[in-house]
Amino acid sequence: MNQFERFQEAIKLENPENNKFIVNPDTNYFVGNTPHGGYLMAIMHKALTSILPHSTSISSSVQYLDRIDAKPFELEVEEFKISSGSSSGIVKLKQNNKICTTFTGTCSDFEHMKGYDYLEKTLPDIFKDRQKKDYVKMNYDKISKGFTPAFIQQLQCSIHPDHAWWNRDSQFNHDNEARCSAFLEMDGGVPDQ
């Protein structure tokens, strides 16, 4: 199973009952002993778009109110407004009988919109001065051993040799501009929304 399939499995929601879901969070998407905020946002977006008639959040806001433990929690979806072109609602994440996080979103049907897609932009000139094979593979443990979450380590990151800061010697000119030119890749193809 590739990373995209694993993530889809990690945010999978089943059988809503009265607009409520019980979620057993996947610890592969934790920072320490608590779920990563982006992971929670993805689950809450999924809950909202599972209940509302529109499939994509076009505007959203998340409030992280209290710590979430590594145990099951409840998502409760409340509809605010439903019309032909958009709908909105709120998702409340509850654990230990208190609201820990809220996600408010307005949704629409972007898959029916027409317009530009996959616009190509040329790479900056710095990508032309070295071949990709010369780029330095990110060593997550050398940077912060044991700190980088597992879900970040799934990312294959190759950094331009001039920007691999962990390999610089003490004679490096620290007055240079901060830059990080890199290739970021993940197995599994183009992600969904």
Protein language model regions, located:
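Terminal targeting signals and extreme-terminal segments of soluble enzymes
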Residues: 1-193
